[in-house]
Structures are given as C-alpha cells and as structure tokens.
Amino acid sequence: GVQRWLYFSKFLKNLGWEPIVITVKKSKASYPVFDNSLESYINNLIVHKTDTLEPLKLYSKIFYGNSKEGIQKGEVLKKNFFHHFAAFIRGNFFVPDARIGWVSYALNKGREIIKKEGIKYIVTTGPPHSSHLIGLKLKKEFSLKWIADFRDPWTSMFYLKEMYRTRFAQKRDENFEKNVLRKADKIITTIGELFHDELIQKANIS
C-alpha cells in the first residue's frame, strides 16, 4: 500500500501536480517497517510528519515485550484470558482500528496545509481505515474533492471476527464505512470485482 501511493506521488509530480504527504513521525510509529530502497522516490516530495497517540503500545509491551512491535493486524493471540481481553479491547474501544489516535494530529496538520496552500484535492488510503475519517472531516470543513482508496476490506475484514466485537462497536464501524463511501467523491479499490460490488451495495450507489 505504501509503495503504490509513493509511486503515484512521483508520477503525479511528473504530470505537473505537487503532492503533499502527511504521515507519522518515524519515532512515533508503533509498527515501523522501513524500506530504504524507496528513499529515492521521496527526494522531491513534500512530506509532513506528525505525532500520534497510540495507547496500544502498552499492549505490545505486555504481550510482545516490545512497544515497537506493534499491533498484529491479522493475528489475535488466544493463549489465555489476557489475550482474549486484549482482543476485546482492540475490537471495541479502538474503532475503526488501533491507529485512531493519529486522526486528530493529521486533521490539525491537514487544516494547516489546506489553508496555507489552497489545497483542492485530497486522497486517503486505508488500512488503517481510520485515515478515511480524516478525509471525511476535511471534505466537510473545506468542500474538497476527495478520493478514498480501499486497499483491503473494512468492516468485512476476516480478523474482526476474532475481536469479540459488540453489536454497538460493529454498528459504529459500519456507519463510519458507509459515511466514507457515500461522502467521498471517488472510491478506488484494487481488491477485485466481488469487493467492488460489496462497496457499491454498502454505499447504495451505482
């Protein structure tokens, strides 16, 4: 996912656009994966890095022994009561995902850039699907054109079934997803035709 939009940013620049990227500071990322071979793609890009708040770093520290290990997106450990409890916390208190703590920081930086640069178009990509909530808010505040990129399913992702979600949490997440699908000007997905049809049905669009 990172590589795809990194490449897009490079080609957009070649076409006369000036992409501006908002991301998390390297020192703040709880699940940092670095590929130094991609550095050449960002030499001429404008990148703004923000803080983030991720209380689930404590989860990583307790169960993985390392706060930088991060939250295993597709794996729920079920060794004992504490792992069951941790899965419940992840699934019900961090909706739509464990990166929800970044939203306010990204929103503040986005507002600052939009006002300063006169931005008219924005793109959000997920997962983490909480990034789409940033686009949803910025579009409402500034009447921007917004593209939402779905690299993976949202509320139908297989591992959510292992997080003991309550009906309330699931419904809240589905409402987030539906609002994004209905309010975004364009939706992009490369997952496949079945998921494409699923998104259309959820959004009640054609």
Predicted regions and their residues:
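An aromatic- and histidine-rich active-site surface loop
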Residues: 91-107, 122-142, 148-156
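Conserved nucleotide-sugar donor-binding subdomain of glycosyltransferases
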Residues: 65-121, 166-174
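Short acidic, glycine/proline-rich loop/turn micro-motifs
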Residues: 117, 158-163
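A short, active-site helix/loop in glycosyltransferases that binds the activated sugar's phosphate group
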Residues: 179-206
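Membrane-proximal helix-turn-helix segments that form the acceptor-binding/catalytic region
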Residues: 8, 130-133, 137-141, 154-155, ...
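Helix C-cap/helix->beta junction micro-motif
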Residues: 15, 117, 138-142
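N-terminal subdomain of nucleotide-sugar transferases
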Residues: 1-56, 186, 192, 196
